[in-house]
Amino acid sequence: MFASLSSAWMLRLKKYGYWIWLIAVLGIPLSYWWSLGSDYPNAWPWLVISVVFGLIPILDAIVGRDPANPEEASEVPEMEAQGYYRVLSLATVPLLLGMLVWSGWILAHETRWDWVGQLGWILSVGTVMGAIGITVSHELIHKDPQLEQNAGGLLLAAVCYAGFKVEHVRGHHVHVSTPEDASSSRYGQSLYSFLPHAYKHNFLNAWRLEAERLKRKGLPALHWRNELIWWYAISALFLLGFSLAFGWLGAIFFLGQSVMAFTLLEIVNYVEHYGLHRRRLDNGRYERTTPEHSWNSNFLLTNLFLFHLQRHSDHHAYAKRRYQVLRHYDSSPQLPNGYAGMIVLALFPPLWRAVMDPKVRAYYAGEEYQLTDTQRI
């Protein structure tokens, strides 16, 4: 639909189109208000999650792809220097946290919902916190300014996944697309095999990496300068606050939306790196990370919602680039739909493998010998 636009018009469209994330955040209170007086009060809490995973994949196919890249010499420096894009991403933080607290209050006081409506509410809020909150935190923790670092950490603390702040930058980006990385799914590996290992390894590896950082400074692992202690303490304060304010239902709400949010994150990791690997060189090291080591998805609509997260190939090759100047590479392996559609597909391993395994084999045509059991484990 928009692929024929000139690069200049596409960049202008996206500059203001990134505010589309507000639809996801406002979808939570809107779904509640629309439920008032409804004959089906337990259906409305499921609205957001239903739209994300039911309607968005269809809209991605209709709206189409975005091939436009900013011009490297003239447009990229100007766009990276514009404070507008930073304000846009940082604006998500107070609105998401406000939405989270308000949603907990609604769950604790809404008497028309039975467990079905309550479950839909928790999953919908978790979907927004995962899709928007963790996506923005991912953008922020890669940047140097302390404000952005702290804002990203706060969003992760709000979903009990602060370890991502350490492990993603110092672990995943170092070992991506190798057997050493728990966030890089192997060829032939199902989502349900991937998730438990990702949860466990990424939590433990975050603590290991932070302990190593402190050791280099001559400090013990359990030291007040261990940032994970502080971030997890904030998560504990969130839990305590929700429990005191909204009772046991508030605690379930906070923990439930957290699990939904960080599970979405790990499913996206599964999608982003499935079956791709960096070759081991003669010296025992792995080849340098390039845009060819992550799946790219260039569907415009979801890229606007997710701050160009789907241009993941460029992100891994150049992690410090800001979201507004991430590039599309035709040479990168390409996903057949946006992340929402790919997440749904990943939930059904036979369908996932029927679609994705041929794409992996085609991408490594002539090098299929690398897709062995040893590469998968």
Curated annotation (Swiss-Prot):
InterPro entries: AlkB/XylM, FA_desaturase_dom. Disulfide bonds: none annotated. It is a multi-pass membrane protein. Signal peptide: none annotated. GO terms for biological process: alkane catabolic process; lipid metabolic process. Pfam families: FA_desaturase. GO terms for cellular component: plasma membrane. Its cofactor is Fe(3+). Fe cation 2 binds at H173, H312, H315, H316. Fe cation 1 binds at H138, H142, H168, H172. It is an enzyme of class 1 (oxidoreductase). Keywords: Cell inner membrane, Cell membrane, Iron, Membrane, Metal-binding, Monooxygenase, Oxidoreductase, Transmembrane, Transmembrane helix. Its EC number is 1.14.15.3. Pathway: Hydrocarbon metabolism; alkane degradation. It catalyses: octane + 2 reduced [rubredoxin] + O2 + 2 H(+) = 2 oxidized [rubredoxin] + octan-1-ol + H2O. GO terms for molecular function: alkane 1-monooxygenase activity; metal ion binding. It comes from the Bacteria. The chain crosses the membrane at residues 17-37, 43-63, 87-107, 116-136, 236-256. Belongs to the fatty acid desaturase type 1 family. AlkB subfamily. Catalyzes the hydroxylation of n-alkanes in the presence of a NADH-rubredoxin reductase and rubredoxin. It preferably hydroxylases C12-C20 hydrocarbons. This is Alkane 1-monooxygenase 2. The lineage of its organism: Bacteria, Pseudomonadati, Pseudomonadota, Gammaproteobacteria, Pseudomonadales. The gene is alkB2.
